[in-house]
Every structure is written in C-alpha cells, then in structure tokens.
Amino acid sequence: MVERSVDAGALPIAVRVYPDLKPSQPQRKAPQIDGMLVFDCETRTDRAQALTFGSYRFLVAGRCLEEGLFYADDLTAAERTMLERYAREHAADTDPRGIPERGIPSNPDLVLLPIADFRTLLYRVAYKGRGLLCAFNFPFDASRCALGYVESRDRFLGGFTFQFFHYRDRNGRLRVNPYRPGIAVKHMDSKRALKGFTGAIDPDKVDQIPEGDIKPKKGYVFRGHMLDLRTLAFALTDRSLSLEGACDLFGVEHGKQKVERHGIITPVYIDYNRRDVLASTELAAKLLADYALHTIELQVTKAYSPASIGKAYLQAMAVAPIMARMPDFPKRYCGHAESAFFGGRASARVRKVPVPVVYTDFMSQYSTVNVLMGLWNFVTAREIRVTEDCREELAALLRDVKPDWVLDASNWKRLAGFARIVPDGDVLPLRAKYRGNSWQIGVNYVHARSDGPKDGLWYAWPDLVASVLLTGKVPRIVEAFRLAPIGKAKGLKKLAFRGQVPIDPRSQDFFQSVIEERARLAARTDLSDTERDRLRRSLKTLGSATSYGIFAQMDRQESDKEVALTCYGIDPEPYRCKVKHPEAPGEYCFPPLASLITSGGHLLLALLERLVADRGGTYAMEDTDSMAIVASQRGGLVPCPGGPYTMKGGREAVRALSWEQVAEIVALFAQLNPYDRTAVPDSILKIEDDNFDPKTGKQRQLWCLAISAKRYVLFLRDRNGEPELLRKNVNNGEDGWSQHGLGHLLNPSDPTSEDRSWIAQAWLGIVRRSLGLATEPLPFADRVALGQITVSSPEVLRPFAKLNADKTYAQQIKPFNFILSCHIAPYGHPADADPEHFHLIAPYETDPRKWLALPWIDQYSGKQYRISTTLATGTRQIARVKSYGDVLEEYAFHEEAKCADASGAPCDKQTVGLLQRRHVTIEWPPRFIGKESNKLEEIEEGSVPDAGDVYTEYLDPRRQERDWHRVVETLRAMTKRQLRELEKRSGISLTTLKAWRRGRTAHSNNRAKLAGALRDGRFG
C-alpha cells in the first residue's frame, strides 16, 4: 500500500446507481397554432402581491385584433375610475386591416374587462380555441389571475393547480366550477415549469379530440398550448434572460421600458404595462420565427431547454436513443458506468494568496472529447459490443501512459472502457463527505480499506489514464471491459440545421460538424451580421446541449409513495429496493457515454496539470474546462506559503511560468485538435480573451485570488499595485468575479434592483485585504443578509398556512409569490430548534427597515420567531441571523475541504497558500445515491436548506443488513458509560439504543445517524 502523509480517517463515500425505470417519453409534434393571447399582470407591492390590473393582446396569424385591460375585483373606486378613464381616452393598438380573407375584423377600442371576464376570454381562446397562451414568467402571471388553488396530483404532483372559474350554490356561496378546467403549474427551475389544463367533469366532445385526430377519445384531456417566453428564450440561447435582456438580444423594436414606481395605478403605469405586453408580443414573434428555422418536430411549448432542441434534432436525423434501439444491452454495464460518473473538476490550488496568472480554457471541452474519442459512432451504432475481461489490455495500455502518449490523438479512441480497481493511493475523483452533510467530488489520493477485490470502485478508462499521468503508477485492476461501436443504425437521415448548415449523420461526426461550421461562419459572406450572430449562437447552444447532458439525464419523480425498482451499480448483480422520489433515465440517457465524456474532460485538465508541473509550475484554480496557470511575463518565484521553493530571505514560494512557457504548453495541445484545420487551425487550449487588453489587443498581466472551488476573482494591478477588477464593458468583455455562494442574496442597497455590483465591492475588499491594502468598510455590512425565494412548491408555501388562514386568495401569500429567506449564524438557532431542520422565511418586504419586525417562520415546524443580527447567540424566541458582513466574512474564509494544506491535514478556514491533494480512505460500504443536481437553484437560494434533502438514496438491503448486524454487535459490546456518551453524541435516546441492542430494527435515517456517531467518536 502507498504510504500516506496524513491519514485523516475514513470518509463516507457515495456512488451513483442506475435505476431501472421507464424513460420519459418523447413529445409529439403539435398542430399549427393560429391564435395567440399574450398577457401581463401588475400587482400590489405588499406581501400578498395581489393583482391590481393587467393588459393583453389577442392575435390571429400575427395580427393584433384586440387589445385590452383587465382589473382585480377589489380595486378602490378611484383605481377603477382611473382605468375606465384611461380606456376611454386611449385607442387600442390593433391592426386596422383585421384579417379580411377570413372576414375577421379588429377592434379599435381599448377593452376594459373585470378579471372574471378576462378568465372567460382566456378559456375561450386557450382552451376552446386551442390557441397559444403566452407570458414572460408564466407561473407568476397565471397565479395572479386565478381565484384559488389546490395542490396538484398525478403528472403535476409537486405543483399547484389554479382555479379560474366559480359559481354560486343555492346558499349563495362561491364554489369552484368543476365543469371548467384549471391550469396546473409545476416548477422545474427559475426558467422552466410544466404547465397544462387539468381535466374537467363532463367535457364537451370536441374538447376530447386529441391533437391531430378527428374523433373524441374517452379520457383525453387537452393540456393546452402554454408558452413561457422566458423558457423559449433559454431553450434557444442557453441563457437566463430577463424580458429586457431577451428583447435586446433578439432585436425587438419596442423593448421593455422602466418605471419609477410600482404598485400605484397611474396613466404612466398603465402605459408601462401595455408596453410590457407589446414587448412580449414582439419578442414572441421573434422567438417563434427563430424556432421555426429549426427543422425539428418538437412542439414549441415543449422546448424546455437547449437539450430539448438537441434531442429533437437527433430525432429529426432518426437517431433513436441507444437503449431504445438496443433494449437487450446489459443494464449491469450501465450500472458500472453510472457508478463511475463524476462531474467536472473544480478546486482552488493556491488559496487566499493573490498570484499572477494566465487564464486558459479548453475549446468546447465536451464536444472536443466526443470527437477525440469517436463517441458519435456509439450514438449512431447498429450495435454496441462489450468485450469483457480486458484487465491485461488495460494494464498494458496504462504502462505506456506518458504526456506524449496522451497528446497522441489516435490513442483517445482506445479509452472507451471501464474498470473496477482497488485504490491504493491512486489520484481519482471521489464523491465523499469532506465537510458537513453534503457530497462533494474531489480528485484525491484514494485508498481502499483493504486489498480485497470487493472493496473496488469503477472508473472510466480516461480517469485511470489521468491517475497514471499524475502518480506514475498503474492501479490494481480487478475487472475491466471496453465498448466498441459496430456498424451504423438503419434509416439515419441528413438535414440542414436552421435550413443553412447541412449535417449527414451517416458520414459526418455531428459533434465535429457543429464546431467546424460555427468556426466557418466568420468567412461566410452570404449571411447578414445579425443572421451570422444568431446562427453562431444556435450552433454553440446545439453543441453544448447534445454533447453531454442528454446522456446523463435523470428525471426525479415527485411522488412521496415508495416505488419498488431494480438498481444496477458496482456489483455484478442488481438489487431491489423501495424509494421515494426515484429517478427515471431520460430519453437519451446512456451512462457509458456520460461517464466517458466527463472523464475525458478530467483527462484534459490532468494533462494540463502535468505539463505545468513538469515545468516546475502550478495553478491557482481549475473549473471544469479552465485553469488559471500561475504565470508572469518573465516567470520566476512568487511568494506563497507552502510552496516548494524558497526565496531570498527564506519565504516559501511557487514558481510562475513565463508567458512563453504557457504558450508552449498551449501549442502542444494543437496535437489534440480533431477538427478540420482549415476551419479550426489552432490548439484546443486557448489563452482566454481576459488576458488581453480590449483596446490594444496586447497581453496583460492577470492576477487571481481563489478561496475555494468556484469562488475566485480575476483582476489587474496598476503601477502602484492597486487592484482593478475585470468589469464587463469597462476593461473586459465579461465580469471577472465569481458570484457562486453570493448570487442568491438580494442587493443590500436596493432589494428591488438586479444590480450585482455589490458583489464586486465585496470581492474588491477581499482582494485589497489579501494584498495588505487599506479597505473601506462596506456600507451595508450590518444589514440582514436576505435572499429572495419563489414560492415554487407546496412545501415552501405550507409554513404560511397560519398566516393565510381566514384570508381571501388575494390577501394570501400565494404560489409563485416572492418571499424572504435569512441565514442562521453559528450558535444562532433558537433554544428549541432542531439545527438540522430549521430555516426561516418571511413575507416579501422591500423596505429593509421592516425586515427585523417581519413574522419569520420556520419552514419545518411552522413556528414563528424574531430575528437579530446583534445577539451573541439565539434565545428561546429569537434567532441570531447573519448580516451581510457575517456572510462575507464566512465567504472569505470558506474552506476548500476536499484539499489538504502543506502538512497534508485537511484544509480549514485558516489555511493559506499552496494546497495539495488529500489522502482519503474509503469508508465501506458506499452510499448509493441518485444525481446531486436536484433542485440546485433552491439549494443556492435557501428554500432547500440542505442539499442532502434532495438526494435520492437507493439502499441496498444486502449491505444494509450486514452493516446493521455489525453495528448491533458494537452496541452489545459497549459499557453503560459508553452508551450514555453515545446518547449525547448521536441525539438518540438511551432507551432506543438499548432496544436496538435487543434486536429491534431501526429506520435508515437513524441507522445513518448512529453510524456517524460511532465513526466520529471514541468510546473508551
């Protein structure tokens, strides 16, 4: 076994499993939609955010035939009078021609409707007429127009069903009309939601005719054509855009305007709202026209993401999903590959020490890996053949690994395989609990608990090549297999992307063609600048969407019912288990491809790391496809604690490479360029534009300060050593600071503003302190650090049940309202609170002076508390919460827990300088989990306080019982004093511990809690 510098004890690890559930079904193409209703709402600015008024446009064949306003029932007489006067004095912006060929006139008058009449219009156009119902941020506007809601069931479970129609019963009470549909909305993330009409009692026969059919079908429910412009803009651009940003990007003539004051009905405010609807209407036309250029069969309302469009292109080329056309492909290989899946590398290597850098990144990393490894041949193969027992072949391959071997592009196609190894100091990605209760992936020296083959883990061959590059040793291989594509699937079809870029899946590598055609656009004279930019953006989006994510897609099911399923993982045989919220593989999910692609990305970074290290250098940070190499114009030693070099005077240092040396490394990667050199002539490793002055084009000295993974800043220094952050449209093309860990917080100076310059202020202070320069106190440091959360699910809304009691829907905190979230300081929990399950939320309020007095409610218990930023600790009724100053201080000291300091001990908050890899011993057995990326936005913003709450764990009953038996034996061997100490450490009562000793079974959560206490404590 390899000797370790520090053994910090065994860490719990987790590996992914492949759950054998039916993949999600592809969407059918919808018929041509003629009519469109576009609407937008304005609201009160109080905590209820109730509808005041809105406006709409009704279009047929692109011509506006009616424009109108609608208003809430509870307006004051003065507010209603204002709207009535406005409607009388302003004409509608309709097309005076109407549609004469159909005999449809337009209405020149600006219509004014009560909200009930607008709901009827919506029903008539969107349900009976099957027109397009359109808004920007659809869930919010739909929820404003509703008269109530219930929690959704079945396909929309985890969402809300909004009610739009009611009637009065015999006693005069309002009742929901069951003969009219509701609209169900299930939040996916800030850009996407599932939407659809719900079923109604005794629907008309015509409403039961499926799309594209002519006869009614019993049980059919028309779900509607509901388009969120924000979602479609995201699907087309892979960017999260505001209405203003989308209008600018797509060249809308009448874009969004601004208004000084919201919530008060004035003629100016009505103008503002009408302009929003006009902007939305013009944006819809632009987006729909852009979407129509894509030669795909996907209904526009089902284009939820770039991946949706990417999959539709595969379908258009008749590229069927691998598991659909090869249903007999052994799922155990999918399980082995899924357990070998790890996301991109991300870490800080030089911590909290500003160092000069050259910032580099790999061109379209995942697409490039696909081309290098020939993975398109797998996507289009007639058959994928598995060759087992490749241990000797793999060992021989690994013995040849050197940098030059990896730089030989012909070797990459030999790496389509997986192996189970017994780690013994090999440098490998490992998903472990390095700190706290969440899983993180670190690339470290991994050690098995024993030499036994059953203690082995599966890895993709590129990860093993990376380990050999970084350690010089071949791992102990227990099992190995490789994959090979055989032939081509039948029926593949060529197409023209957006009608302009021909792609033939039979003879071309799709991933390669997308990159090459994008590069060739600059030389095309047949395109306008606008169309060239749009085509370039579309090709980039398509390449990103199809090169990785669709092969890794797992869709979490929201049902709270336990589902029995079969899981494939690290073992030759699968196991059966029951879980809540299982994950179904996506339509194109194929774990071998997903794992090979990400491991190929790891290998590129490992090769870059090795080439830098061979020249005596290091890097400040790495992030998936980028690396900030410590480098200066002439190179030399740079002061850095923990560095391997010594400067005059005895200070520890790292070596900065020269710009020339970095350029030499970049040139080496030209050998791995798999593209047509007439289109892409240079290296796949790029020196980023940030390194060059945008005015002169000359290279400039960048500096980097990294705290931990994804928390770093790039900056310049003037002649006096003063730092200057990289700022978009000031001295750079993009901002040079990370928002990770801060982006969910409100602007402390103006909570209604989307301006994030306060984060730049914070980073500048961190940089100045690291340079030993004077720093001005932040003016907002003492304010409560608050985030804005959307009430996106019933579980977020339930804590407000007491606050909402006996109030009308308009007065309630409603679905898709904005609410506030704060963060508990260390030792700040109230005395009776469970720190593991405690999160305070409050009604939305824009006035910071009122934040401390709001009713703050624990999301778990529903109890109400007060908050303070000045108490030392929490009390029975008061929670000590973090101020912006507290958050930023923690941010600046956030440890890089998956790395080690110079001595080999785990990095902590005080660690400064050069980090190294940890030596990690695996705690066996591993935990078997699903994807880590469930509800990432909610975790970031705070509505899901603990990432562990959204992992799906697939317990293996075979291991579970063996492990529990060992725990029970340990309990039986403990003395009374040891049991009492265990009670304190675990929080599990002595009575329960004794019952388990006698043989009573325990819930899996309690088993995990007990195992953790036994692992962390010494009971002497």
What are these regions, as identified by a protein language model?
Residues D956-T975, L979:
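A short, Lys/Arg-rich alpha-helix, primarily the initiator
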